[in-house]
């Protein structure tokens, strides 16, 4: 699910689809989901790389850096990877934009989570809090900038970063801020939902459910079953 299911969920939001209705009924038997999966499959079959059904973050990053991927929708944190001239052959040719929409009022923007968590059962709570405070501090950001460059500082830790003249020179800085400010996890889809989350439903059961559903979608992309069959199994 974390490889292909995350993207398709973001896309589905812009098509008006949702994982569950307000009564927690699965919604894969809807026209919105059929439109989402068919659009993605048709687009990738026509213009995507061979074996796209099994590609994830690392495969897509590698292709983009080699100039073999013309459009990649993923996390804003990946922007520094594709603009680093030491790793990317297209570093000086990359542009950035908000993810597209279908005219229904919601973009297919990527949003996983900006969060650092501490396990409830930890014996090192104070140390964990101290680490998080340091890892999100201005001192840490300046340390990264000094050693790795401003393009590589954590983009989601501090609002004040976007007021820094040096960071404002980074080509994707403003687009990253726009993306963060446009995120709305409580209203990620066209229709109301009982869950919070843009690319997932924030419930304990979701990872297992989403893995099963994503495997059915991947089988459809690979031609092992039809889109209709995949959606029927997801609905079940």
Give the ranges of each region predicted by the language model.
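Flexible glycine/proline-enriched surface loops and loop-helix/loop-strand junctions
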Residues: 17-26, 45-47, 65, 111-116, ...
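Glycine-centered hinge/linker elements that transmit conformational signals in sensory
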Residues: 23-54, 95, 99
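Short helix-initiation/N-cap motifs at beta->coil->alpha
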Residues: 51-66
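Solvent-exposed, amphipathic alpha-helical segments
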Residues: 208-223
């Amino acid at each position: 699910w974390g490889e292909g299911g995350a993207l398709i969920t973001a896309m589905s939001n812009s098509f008006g689809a949702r994982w569950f209705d307000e009564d927690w009924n699965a919604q894969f038997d809807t026209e919105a989901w059929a439109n989402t999966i068919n659009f993605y499959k048709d687009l990738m079959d026509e213009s995507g790389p061979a074996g796209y059904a099994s590609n994830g973050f690392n495969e897509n990053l590698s292709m983009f850096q080699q100039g073999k991927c013309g459009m990649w929708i993923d996390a804003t944190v990946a922007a520094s990877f594709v603009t680093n001239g030491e790793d990317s052959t297209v570093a000086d040719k990359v542009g950035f934009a908000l993810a597209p929409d279908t005219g229904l009022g919601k973009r297919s923007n990527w949003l996983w989570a900006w969060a650092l968590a501490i396990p409830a059962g930890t014996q090192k709570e104070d140390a964990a809090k101290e680490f998080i405070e340091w890892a999100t501090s201005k001192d840490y950001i300046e340390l990264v900038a000094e050693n790795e460059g401003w393009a590589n500082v954590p983009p989601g830790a501090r609002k004040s970063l976007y007021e820094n003249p040096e960071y404002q020179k980074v080509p994707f800085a403003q687009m990253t801020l726009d993306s963060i400010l446009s995120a709305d996890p409580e209203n990620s889809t066209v229709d109301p939902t009982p869950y919070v989350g843009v690319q997932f439903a924030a419930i304990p059961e979701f990872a297992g459910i989403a893995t099963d559903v994503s495997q059915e979608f991947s089988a459809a992309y690979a031609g092992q079953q039809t889109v209709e069959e995949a959606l029927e199994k997801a609905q079940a």
